Curated annotation (Swiss-Prot):
Its EC number is 5.1.3.32. It is found in: Cytoplasm. Its main location: cytoplasm. It comes from Escherichia coli (strain K12). This is L-rhamnose mutarotase. Pathway: Carbohydrate metabolism; L-rhamnose metabolism.
């Protein structure tokens, strides 16, 4: 498994709405993530800084990257643009984090 972590932002007034939209996520999005090899996906909120920290275990970079081109992912990104900063393609603005420590 490949461990990935990344940071996103959430609008200051949208913390509760962001959480509501993820509990639960759309069943078809969950199915796409799982079918593309995503496991143990978690997102944490830093309320003081309006930051989201996400971590996920993936089976391959290629399969993970392919999620972005699915119809359900494109619809999800558009659905989330009013609660978080987005790129021109509606993907969330994010920064990948470098792993510096891991305790198995």
């Amino acid at each position: 498994m490949i461990r990935k972590a990344f940071v996103m932002q959430v609008n200051p007034d949208a913390h509760e709405e962001y959480q509501r939209r993820h509990n639960p996520i759309w069943p078809e999005l969950e199915a796409v993530l799982k079918s593309h090899g995503a496991h143990n996906y978690a997102i944490y909120l830093d309320k003081a800084r309006n930051l989201l920290f996400a971590m996920v275990e993936i089976e391959s970079e290629e399969r993970w990257n392919a999620v972005a081109s699915t119809d359900v992912c494109q619809r999800w990104w558009k659905y989330m643009t009013d609660v978080m900063p987005a790129n021109p393609d509606n993907s969330p603005v994010s920064s990948e984090l470098q792993e510096v420590f891991y305790l198995p």
